[in-house]
């Protein structure tokens, strides 16, 4: 009888389950906190909870994750350069560097104008060490992808970093939606690479050299190599797995399923034993894409969502934070700090117009990992990172320790790195 290992790496916890493939009977299960600084720690903790004996008979792994979804919802990911060929991008997904060059094709696939490879080369050389991936999108590239393929090859040769073309992700018309999808995919490539590398490394520690199948956002499976190239297809992977799991556990072929995790709350529908798909492309964070996935409504509200008091208003922010109960068990002095704030803090009388500027006295900062652009930090932010690595601190505490104004610490910018 085949034995399978199911792994789910979420924004808060990593879950592992051993089951008989033919019967669906669960043989063992375990949970461990997801460790974003080093994913392998959380994965290892979950597998240790399963035990070596139970793992020894596993013949395949199914991996689902909300890391891609959470990265998109929270606006995180790697630094991306965008090359637009023949038309500028009019969407709202942010990029770190962008260029628009001559080239592109018409709706019949005929070349509209020659590709300006000289401008492409100048741009690519100007972003060396400034970006981690390149997104390439040409006008009507779904009819003729030659220009996109040329730029992708140049990016890999000059920069030596991952590059992805819009036509590789979507065959649908709609330039801006295709570019948005491509940018998201580029941002997620290092995220997916880290996840697969972490899973593969921990499996080898347990003597397992077996296939890993990654759950797509539509509930089907994809290979490791495909997941590395098209990580955006794993957006809503975790919620899709939840839909299928709920159907299997309840025996219901028609259901509405609500899955609240640490970072997001997801609601999906099962009809006739299958997840209802968003064939026209799903919307993530208010942005239209060409990603075909389960039709799931995702909101940045979860068990770890940041709660802000903005004047008279209570605001749920999509960013994920460490719950105070967890922080208190991990670091000393948290409770005493909260009691001090409760006895002395004065609430804001007027709400701030820019919610990103609101940082409360009860919010302490600790590093999850080093920023991707560590070499570009100014002296104040670099010192701030050193201080909070020693113990969690508020912005005010860190500012006093450094002898600077609190406003000089770029906390919001650092959180996005």
Feature roles, as predicted:
Residues 1-417:
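N-terminally biased helix-coil "hinge/interface" segments that flank
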């Amino acid at each position: 009888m085949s034995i399978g290992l199911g792994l789910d790496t979420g924004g808060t916890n990593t879950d592992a389950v051993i089951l008989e493939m033919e019967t669906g009977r669960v043989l063992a299960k375990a949970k461990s906190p997801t460790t974003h600084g080093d994913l392998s720690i959380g994965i290892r903790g979950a597998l240790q909870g399963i035990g070596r004996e139970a793992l020894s008979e596993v013949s395949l792994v199914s991996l689902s994750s909300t890391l891609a979804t959470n990265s998109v919802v929270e606006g995180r990911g790697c630094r991306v350069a965008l090359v637009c060929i023949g038309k500028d991008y009019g969407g709202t997904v942010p990029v770190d560097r962008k260029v628009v060059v001559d080239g592109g094709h018409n709706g019949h696939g005929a070349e509209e104008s020659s590709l300006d490879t000289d401008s492409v080369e100048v741009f690519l050389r100007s972003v060396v060490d400034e970006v981690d991936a390149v997104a390439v999108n040409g006008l009507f590239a779904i009819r003729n992808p030659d220009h996109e393929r040329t730029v992708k090859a140049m990016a890999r040769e000059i920069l030596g970093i991952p590059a992805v073309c819009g036509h590789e992700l979507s065959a649908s018309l709609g330039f801006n939606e295709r570019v948005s999808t491509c940018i998201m995919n580029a941002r997620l490539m290092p995220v997916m690479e880290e996840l697969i590398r972490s899973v593969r490394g921990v499996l080898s520690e347990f003597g397992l050299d077996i296939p890993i199948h990654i759950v797509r956002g539509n509930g089907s499976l994809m290979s490791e190599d495909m997941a590395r190239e098209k990580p955006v297809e794993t957006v809503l992977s975790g919620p899709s797995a939840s839909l299928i799991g709920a159907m299997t556990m309840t025996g219901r072929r028609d259901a509405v399923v609500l899955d609240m995790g640490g970072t997001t709350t997801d609601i999906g529908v099962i009809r006739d034993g299958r997840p209802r798909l968003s064939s026209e492309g799903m919307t993530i964070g208010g942005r239209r894409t060409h990603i075909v996935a389960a039709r799931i409504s995702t909101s940045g509200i979860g068990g770890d969502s940041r709660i802000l008091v903005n004047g008279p208003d209570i605001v749920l922010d999509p960013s994920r934070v460490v719950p105070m109960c967890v922080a208190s068990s991990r670091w000393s002095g948290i409770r005493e700090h909260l009691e001090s704030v409760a006895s002395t803090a004065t609430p804001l009388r007027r709400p701030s117009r820019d919610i990103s500027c609101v940082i409360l006295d009860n919010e302490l900062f600790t590093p999850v990992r080093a920023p991707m652009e560590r070499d570009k930090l100014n002296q104040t932010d670099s010192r701030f990172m050193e201080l909070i690595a020693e113990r969690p601190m508020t912005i005010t505490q860190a500012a006093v320790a450094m002898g600077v104004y609190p406003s000089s610490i770029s906390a919001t910018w650092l959180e996005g790195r």
